[in-house]
Every structure is written in structure tokens, then in C-alpha cells.
UniProtKB/Swiss-Prot annotation:
Belongs to the krueppel C2H2-type zinc-finger protein family. CDD domains: KRAB_A-box (cd07765). The gene is ZNF844. It is found in: Nucleus. This is Zinc finger protein 844. Keywords: DNA-binding, Metal-binding, Nucleus, Repeat, Transcription, Transcription regulation, Zinc, Zinc-finger. Transmembrane segments: none annotated. GO terms for cellular component: nucleus. One of its GO terms (biological process) is regulation of transcription by RNA polymerase II. It comes from Homo sapiens. The keyword DNA-binding applies.
Amino acid sequence: MDLVAFEDVAVNFTQEEWSLLDPSQKNLYREVMQETLRNLASIGEKWKDQNIEDQYKNPRNNLRSLLGERVDENTEENHCGETSSQIPDDTLNKKTSPGVKSCESSVCGEVFVGHSSLNRHIRADTAHKPSEYQEYGQEPYKCQQRKKAFRCHPSFQMQEKAHTGEKLYDCKECGKTFISHSSIQRHMIMHNGDGTYKCKFCGKACPCLSIYLIHERVHTGEKPYKCKQCGKAFSYSTSLQIHERTHTGEKPYECKECGKAFGSPNSLYEHRRTHTGEKPYECKQCGKAFRWFHSFQIHERTHSEEKAYECTKCGKAFKCPSYLCRHEVTHSGKKPCECKQCGKALSYLNFQRHMKMHTRMRPYKCKTVEKPLILPVRFEDMKELTLERNLMNASTVVKPSIVPVPFTIMKGLTLERNPMNVSSVVKPSFLPLPFDIMKGLTLERNRMSVSNVGKPSDLPHTFKCMEGLTLKRNPMNVSSVVKPSFFPLPFDIMKGLTLERNPMSVSNVGKPSHLPHTFKCMKGLTLESNCMNLNNVKKPLDLSETFKFMKRHTLERNPIRNMEKHSTISLPFKYMQQCTEDRMPMNVKSVTKHSYLPRSFEYMQEHTLERNPMNVRNAEKRSIIFLLCVYTKGCTLERNHINVRIVGKHSVCLVPFVDIKGLTLE
């Protein structure tokens, strides 16, 4: 039958753990160890109660050197006196087994059973000084990186593994790594629940009392280890040692592949995964693998939506501790980030924005414009702005153009919009364009297309209700004008105007013609109706005709073809709703001086493609056109209410239409 060794049943404490025990626990420990020694037949060393506290006051001593070892019968030393007699034990009142050899220390005179016990005791007496105990044939194990000496080779091997980052044993449940097999065995007891000491708070089982006491600090928040330099407290002695290296700058753990040094072995071990590409932590739900355990823990909370870190002041919960630390700064009012260039203290988010001011970093650049463009544009509500929008596209500009554009609500702006397209401008152009509600602006819109302009043009246009303006509308088409023309065109309600209607087509006019035409009920005007066809007239013609019921007059109407003087035309349209495409409110090709057009867009909801309300190309003098459209809802394509091609002087035509409801196509 094999004898039981003391290593199999002994429980060891570190210096920090022994200091945490109260006197009753220390007395209990002494009694248990004494009873254990009495029951072991292979132990013959003297037991002294007073040496227990001395052992834990001296961290270099091993408890087993005070309690004894198994008898080493195979080795002999010259300084040991061999004896076959039984060694009396005053404390245990027992005799050792026959044939036990005793060894006496030459330093202090104590007698030990076995050479290994004596050798450990000599190291304790000489305090790890190799010059004093080399005579006994013992070579100390020194670490070349930290210059630390070890008593036995296994401890030295563990230290070497720590420096190289080699950890052979990983816990699959919590991700911790261990150097020795015994360490992971003790650790697995906590997960399996086989330990004798169970935590009152969480129910975890600990294999021994020392681990149980250390585990309790997680719940109690006890931090007995304080840094002498900064006063920071820690729960574990190893954490304090790693923290002290931040003050000294010591980084003993170096990576062999890249040469990077670290202050703790765990940091080195995790760093090695960047070279090997190892990702040991895999999510069971989605299969995603992670290199670090804390990243794996944060990822698992995305599936469970668990927020384990809660703010003590406001109760807000977070998924990871880094978010909680940033949140706690908002309560304390501290600004941890300080700018090294200007010394300004900022929060984490504002610090990143602040550093761009010093570095002059501009990550957002326009691909089409080389020079910077300054536009004071105020957007109150912009929700769905998308790609490639150029609110002002200026290709060749000599002087800057300042365009204040306040947009109250802009929800649906889309791609490639150019409200103002200026190709070649010599002087700045000032265009106040207030848009209250713009919801449906779409692609390729050019509200003002100016190709060649000598001086600035101020164009205020008032449109109260424009809901259905469509493509290519030209209510007034003036090709060549020598003097300005004044056309007050009030449109009350425009409902049914359709394509290609020319109520008055004046080609060549010498003198004015006054034609008051009253159409009370015109519902069904049809095609090719020419009530008055005058080809060549030199003097004015006064025609007062009352048409009470004209229902089927249609398009291609030319009441006046050729005249030499002005024609004054006032066209009030009460009900005009369906004006359609090809409308140009003012088409002037060549302009030398200013053109003033006041614009007010109150409700523009469905503006569509290729609209040019003002196309000014060639004109010699100013054209002042005031267009008041009260309700224009359904304007349609290619309408030219006034088609004046060659005019020498002003044309004034007064034609009141009371009810025009059913004008139709061609």
C-alpha cells in the first residue's frame, strides 16, 4: 500500500491570504494541520505552532518546509548525520517509521527528515543567496528577463511560459487561461460546483478557503491592495503588481515575433492571437468567432438584449462597461480629453471634432467643384437628402455668388437638382428665393437658366398656389423686343386650358386695336374657328360683339393677324386649371440690362423636370413682367396665350373672358 504524501493533503496560503484570516480561522488551521500530521505515517518532521505565523510573514518560505516532507531514502549528503534510530517527536508524541534518516541544518541546527526538506530550509535561511548555498550543490533558477530566482524547476518553467505568452490550458466556459494543469483543475471546480466552499451570493463553489475569500471580494467590493503612488485600490495582489508597472514603465513580457512588450502575461497571450489569427470564442447562435473573450461577451448580449452595466445615478443600463464609463462623465461634468495644442478640455465626442480644426482635415469634398464654395444655407428640417445634389452649380464664376436660401421643410429632395444654374457670370447675382414648403422637387430643375448676363438680375415672382406645373410652359413667348412690354395677367382660376391655344395671334401690327369681347358662356369652343380674320389693316378697328352662347369654338383662332400699331390685351381668366407643359413665363434670349421678376413660392409641391420659369438669352432693354397666378393647378403643354414675334411698340389688348370652361385641343 502506497503511503500518502503531505503534498496530497496540504493546503497552502499566500502572504496576502494569511493576513486576511482572523485568529479563530488561524487556530482552526493549526488544529487541522496537526491532526493531519498525526495521521500521516511518512511524516517525521517536528511541528511547531509558533512557526506558522512566521511562515506567512515571510513570503519566501514554503509551508511545507515547516511541516515536513516525505522521507528521501535514496540520497545522502555529507553534512547529514545518518541514523537508524527513531526520532522522537515532542509535538506529535509519535515515533517515525523505522529506517528514517534525519538531516541537521548547519545554519540553524534544526533537524529535518529527508534531504529535500533540508534543502528548502537552507534556501529559506540564506534568503535565496546563491553564493551561500552553492556549497550544498544547489543551482538557483534565475529568470533572465526579470532576474528572479526560483527554488524549484517547475516554478521556473511556469515563469518562462508567462514571459513567452504560452498558456496551454484554456477554460471553455469563461475563457480564462492557465499555465499549469493543477490551476485549471482548481478553477473548474468553481464551474462544476464540486467545491466545499459555496458562495452565499451567487452559489459558486470554491475548492479551498483562500479562493473562496478572494471570490467574495467580487460581491463585497473589497479592495485591500492600494497603490502607494496614486492610492488606487485593487481586489487582487496580481492586479496591483500589474498596475505598479504603469508607474515604473516596466514591460517584462515581450513578443518574439514583433518585439512588442507588455506589462502582464495575459496581454501578451492575447497579443499573440493577432499573429496566429486564432479566434477561440465562437457564438453558438450565429457562429461568429471572436479573438477576445470580452468581445464575445458583448456580442452575446446582442442576442439576449441584456444590459448588465447600470448607472447608479440615473439607472440607465448599458451593454459594455466602456459605454457606462462614458455615460458617467456626463454626471460628473468632467472633460477627460484635453487638447495638447490649445489646452482645451473636451468630452470624447467633441474632442474628435475639435482635432479636425487643428489638422485641417476635410473628409467631405465636392467632386465637381475644385474651389471651396461658401453657401449660407439654412435647413431646418432635412430628412431625406440624397446623393449628388448641387443646389447651385457654377462652372465659371469670376466673383462669388451669395445665395441665401431658407428651406423650412425639405423632405423629398432627390438627385441632380440645380435650382440655379449659372454658367458664365461676370458680376454676382442676388436671388432671394423663399420656399415655404417644398416636398416633391425632382430631377434636373433649373428655375433660372442664365447663359450670358452682363449685370445682375433680380427676379421676384409671386406664385401663390402652384401645384401642377409641368414641363415646357411658355405663357408668353417674346423672341425679339426693342422696348419693354407690360403685361398684367391676373389668372383667378385656370381650369381647362389645353394645348396650342392662341386666342390672339398678332404677327404684324401697325396701330392698336381695341377689341372688347365678352364671352359669357363659352363651353364648347372647337377647332378652326376664325371669327375675325384680318390680314392687312392700317387703321384701328373697333368691334363690339357680344357672344352669349358660343359653345363649339376651337383652336387656331387669329382675331387679328396683321396690324401696324399696338394691341392692348387684358386677359382675365377666372377658371383656368389645367395648363400643361411647354410653358415659359418669360422667354427672353438676349438681355443687356436688368430684368426684375418678383417670385414668391408659397406652395410648390410637385415640381417636375426641366422647368425654366425664366429663360433670358438676348434682349436689349429691361422686361418687367409681373405674373400673378392665384390658382394654377392643371396647366398643360405648349400654351402661348400671347405670341408676339415682331413688335415695334407696346401692344395692349383687352379681352375679358367671363366663363371659359371647355376650351379643348386644336
